[in-house]
Amino acid sequence: MGEPVLTRVHSLRERMDSTLANHRNEILMFLSRIESHGKGILKPHQLLAEYEAISKEDKLKLDDGHGAFAEVIKSTQEAIVSPPWVALAIRLRPGVWEYVRVNVHHLVVEELSVPQYLQFKEELVIGSSDANFVLELDFAPFTASFPRPTLTKSIGNGVEFLNRHLSAKMFHGKDSMHPLLEFLRLHNYNGKTLMLNNRVQNVNGLQSMLRKAGDYLSTLPSDTPYSEFEHKFQEIGFERGWGDTAERVTEMFHMLLDLLEAPDASTLETFLGKIPMVFNVVILSPHGYFAQENVLGYPDTGGQVVYILDQVPALEREMIKRIKEQGLDIKPRILIVTRLLPDAVGTTCNQRLEKVFGAEHAHILRVPFRTEKGILRKWISRFEVWPYIETFTEDVAKEIALELQAKPDLIIGNYSEGNLVASLLAHKLGVTQCTIAHALEKTKYPDSDIYWEKFDKKYHFSSQFTADLIAMNHTDFIITSTFQEIAGSKDTVGQYESHTAFTMPGLYRVVHGIDVFDPKFNIVSPGADTSVYFSYKEKEKRLTTLHPEIEELLYSSVENEEHLCIIKDKNKPILFTMARLDNVKNLTGFVEWYAKSPKLRELVNLVVVGGDRRKESKDLEEQAQMKKMYELIDTYKLNGQFRWISSQMNRVRNGELYRYIADTKGAFVQPAFYEAFGLTVVEAMTCGLPTFATLHGGPAEIIVHGKSGFHIDPYHGEQVAELLVNFFEKCKTDPSQWDAISAGGLKRIQEKYTWQIYSERLLTLAGVYGFWKHVSKLDRLEIRRYLEMFYALKYRKLAESVPLAKDE
């Protein structure tokens, strides 16, 4: 038997050349179909439709029996048609792209570099640009010397890779340990030294003192308080911060000795996570109505507010626990910084400071938007905030200094403008920065980059995409809720991945905007507030006193601004959805699927919570969606099987509403065209309500299809309706089917989606990236200078072009 032979992997261009050489007629026929669409951009579904339209025999010839050509077509994320050329952006796997173009008339294939492909794409909008100099953004040179993984499975596990790299660097002898020694000596709180004082001068001295102190600790009972040996330890170089008892201090000393002897990734992460580093946290979320009551459902006010208000008490609990275990008597502070709205429309958004429910040392700090003419009083859309951000940041810096009487240790940004403010503050203060996007708008609005000028008057995406690029490249680490947020799936492009290479013709060209393999990316999934969201089976915790209100909401025969249409048959299960009323959330699309399915209407009632009919909306998307909802009700005569309820702001009652619907043996549907994470999906599953959710985005990872819920494709409404019909028909004949999905959802949440897991991970990340920031500060300075220039020369002018709002 012969030995196995390693063969060279042929490049994409070589494989295409081979197919062209062997099947010119079939290729010509297919490409001619593509070219016939005329000048423009073709999306994956259009390319696949053209491929499926060719005969079975031709497909077999094209694929040479190996499926090679089909694989290229399935991997193509867009085709740029500019006859006689067709250019393809081919995504070989998440984060790995190749670009080619084919001359349809001569069947010639050319490989394209990223700038060449983007230039070809720009010609759709501005014609030939050969003579013009174009600003190209390329962040790759600044990270060339940084470690980066190459395996898809490493995406989103940045801290693990970073720990392996850092521990490997520390193997190079005593000198390589010096940054760790310096890092420990830098620690202080309000001027008081922590961890090590100046009696420890070098690594040899540190090792010697650790062994000496360890010998002494071994003579003490494990629960001996640190205060009993504090003075003795201070004399040999150790300050508070190692632990509150002899046992915890011993554990830390052993870990550090192990790291100094033979560093390993796991020990390094554990050790850095236990160092006292985070006492003051600032969380930025400027847009919308940020308050704890009576705001959910207001424009720009939804999942992000819930996320932060659930995040903060859990984060504070973990900080308090760690600080105590570190042997310190320090009260942590968390400030959620948002915009102060003088016209607060019945909310607390006009109060400067508001204590966070369920937390001891956390507050909402509100700072107004202002210009030279004074303070802006009214709410404005998240798309219109850009001219106010720089002044807002200056004011925020003063306010947090006043409140904390210290610099924050960690700054967390949320959404585009919050992340830009976080970047400006972190840059100014020299503080560790964490970025949470929640949603990057570029992926939600197809072609909003190439045709940015069409969108800019309404959405000002030129400012927003520029802010996103600055923030994601400035930050120390990025948290995402899902893998898809970073790098999509086998077939779809991730939100961050879509910023790898793109162009805004006439503005600038992004040759390398972000690398999804960058070790700054970490998946840290949130949970639901377990005091509000819990299983419908936990009878002793159920809020039955709210049931009359819920029944009024769902079933009363009264139609008013709160609820429209009535439900006649109260014995049927309820199909339920709750979201903002905008295009992407697709509530009206879901209502239409239901309306067009007689079988589904026969099996279940439909209840939709979204939009606020109690007041006139100022949001243009919401206005259009409301109009469409009214039309659907009339066209399909939904009254009798359908209830449209205005947005509900009482979270506690919403939790019981999920459980009440579970009592009816109903289900929750999340029909969005794209959902970055899917907090309502987690809420519904936590309450034991079987959930059907979009496969575009985070819910595809939260739900294991058929076990803990179901994936749905919002672009194929008939199939979704059919899936729902099948589920409810099965449950009708076999109720255990409903119970199995309900239990599967609960199990999935308990294993992966809790705020305790989230908080532990976040604080550990802050420790590791704080250390990384320390050891790589010179390299980071280079990219930050580049970003300063981009901010000053490009972003500021774009922001100034956004019209200032006027108070009516």
Curated annotation (Swiss-Prot):
* Catalysed conversion reaction: an NDP-alpha-D-glucose + D-fructose = a ribonucleoside 5'-diphosphate + sucrose + H(+)
Annotated region GT-B glycosyltransferase: where? Answer: 277-754
Short name of one Pfam family for this protein?
SUS_EPBD
What superkingdom does the record give?
Eukaryota
Biological process according to GO: sucrose metabolic process
Q: How is its activity regulated?
A: Fructose acts as a non-competitive inhibitor with an inhibition constant of 17.2 mM. In contrast, glucose inhibits uncompetitively with an inhibition constant of 4.3 mM.
Bilayer-crossing regions: none
Q: Which SUPFAM superfamilies match?
A: UDP-Glycosyltransferase/glycogen phosphorylase
Tissue expression notes: Expressed in stems, in roots at different developmental stages, and in flower buds, flowers and maturing seeds, with the highest levels in strong utilization sinks for sucrose such as growing stems and tap root tips.
The kind of enzyme this is, by top-level EC class, is transferase
* Subunit structure and binding partners: Homotetramer.
What's the stated role of this polypeptide? Sucrose-cleaving enzyme that provides UDP-glucose and fructose for various metabolic pathways.
UniProt name for this protein: Sucrose synthase isoform 1
